[in-house]
Swiss-Prot record:
Residues 1-32 are annotated as: Disordered. Core component of nucleosome. Nucleosomes wrap and compact DNA into chromatin, limiting DNA accessibility to the cellular machineries which require DNA as a template. Histones thereby play a central role in transcription regulation, DNA repair, DNA replication and chromosomal stability. DNA accessibility is regulated via a complex set of post-translational modifications of histones, also called histone code, and nucleosome remodeling. This is Histone H3-2. Its main location: nucleus. The nucleosome is a histone octamer containing two molecules each of H2A, H2B, H3 and H4 assembled in one H3-H4 heterotetramer and two H2A-H2B heterodimers. The octamer wraps approximately 147 bp of DNA. Gene3D superfamilies: Histone, subunit A (1.10.20.10). Residues 1-17 have a biased composition (Basic residues). It comes from the Eukaryota. Belongs to the histone H3 family. GO terms for molecular function: DNA binding; protein heterodimerization activity; structural constituent of chromatin. It is found in: Nucleus; Chromosome. Pfam families: Histone (PF00125).
Length: 114
């Protein structure tokens, strides 16, 4: 006995175990997944750079007409008026979510709730 470490024998066994597991599943590779929060942060950066409207135009227009019909029937809207309402609504909602997020961070929370 020379006092050196004995060669490790279980490494080859682990390799065989790994390859047999891959062969058993048919070698199907799992689809790539980002860590939780990564995609959310990427979307936040993307939407903060952009200036386009985030709510689809036609559903918003239907909502405006539905609300207006409660006050008066047969109202007509210029397309620019609906667009102005949508711009104002989205600006308000963005500001509301910013304030909500600050309040959540202040309360040491991550999730915002209604």
């Amino acid at each position: 006995n020379t006092g050196g470490k004995a060669p490790r024998k279980h490494i080859a066994h682990k390799q065989a175990k790994k390859s047999s597991a891959a062969a058993a599943t048919g070698g199907v590779k799992k689809p790539h997944r980002f860590r939780p929060g990564t995609v959310a942060l990427r979307e936040i950066r993307r939407f903060q750079k952009s200036t386009e409207l985030l709510i689809r135009k036609l559903p918003f227009q239907r909502l405006v007409r539905e609300i207006a019909s409660e006050f008066k029937n047969d109202l007509r809207f210029q397309s620019s008026a609906v667009l102005a309402l949508q711009e104002a609504s989205e600006a308000y909602l963005v500001g509301l979510f910013e304030d909500t997020n600050l309040a959540a961070i202040h309360a040491k929370r991550v999730t915002i709730m209604p």
